[in-house]
Amino acid sequence: MKQPLILGLLLSIALPLFAQKKAFTYSFYGQVRGDLYVESRASQEIVDGLFYLYPKDHAYDADGNDLNAAASGNFYLLYSRLGLDVKGPNIGSAQSSLKLEVDFRGSGSNWATLRIRHAYVNLDWGKHALLAGQTWHPLFGDVFPQMLNLSTGAPFQPFNRSPLVRYRFQPQGWQLTAAAVWQLQYLSNGPNGKSEEYIKNSCVPEFYLGIDRKGDGWQVGAGVDVLSLTPRKQTTIDGQIFKVSERVTGVTGEL
C-alpha cells in the first residue's frame, strides 16, 4: 500500500508543476560589445580606461613637462553580456517575473570573469510592484544621458547596481519609490579601503525614498538617500586594542 500512496503523492506534486510550466515564458538576449578608445590625456578612470570619469590635472616633472599630457588607448570586449527574462505565473493577483544578466567585467582588477549585473524577482500588481534582488540603485533614475561611452554621465550620474528590496506605487502620471539597499560590487570606502564590512557592521541598510511625475516627453522628480556606516569596531593606541562605537551617516538628495 505504501507504493501507490507514494506514487499518488508524487503525481499530486508533479501535475501542478507540469501545469505551471505553461504559465512561464522566457527570452534570451545579449550582445557582443567591443570598446575601442583613444584618450589624448591621462584621465581618472576605472576598468583600465573603459569607464571614463574626468581628465587629470597638470603634474609637472623637473623640466616643467606635464606628465599627464600623454595619450593612451586600448580595445576590450569585457562588457559583452548575456541575459534571461522570464515571465512567470500569477501569484495571487500579482504578475511574477525575473531577470538574470551577466557580463565579463569581473570585479576590481580581476577582469574577464563572469559578473552578475541583474538578478531579481519582481511581483507586479499593476499600480504596485515589489522587487527583490540586484538591479540599478534607485539614485540611477530614469533620466540619464544617451551615449556610446559606458560611463553614462558618471561621476555625476551614479552608475551602480546593488542588492535591494524596492517597492513602487504608480498611480497615473506618478511614481513613488521606496527601497532598502545593501552593497556587493559597488562599495563604500573606509579605513580598510573599499569594503562591504562598513554597511554590514552597521546592521542598517541604505534607505531611499523618491517621487517622480511623468508626462508626454518630460519627467521631473526628487529623492533622498540615507546611508549609515560603521567604519570600525576597534582601534589600536600604543599597542593596546580598544573597542569603539562609531557611526557615519550621510544624506544625499537628488532633483
Q: Where do the PLM segments sit?
A:
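Sec-dependent N-terminal signal peptides
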Residues: P4-I13
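Sec/Tat signal peptide C-region and signal peptidase I cleavage site
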Residues: L15-A19
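Outer membrane beta-barrel
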Residues: K21-D48, A59-Y60, G64-Y186, C203-V204, ...
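Solvent-exposed, glycine/polar-rich loop segments of beta-barrel outer-membrane systems
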Residues: I46-P55, T235-I241
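Extracellular loop and loop/strand-boundary signature of outer-membrane beta-barrel proteins
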Residues: L67-A70, R105, L148-G153, N189-E197, ...
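A short secondary-structure junction signal
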Residues: V143-F144, A179, L187-N192, G223, ...
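Detector for outer-membrane/organellar transmembrane beta-barrel domains
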Residues: D216-L255
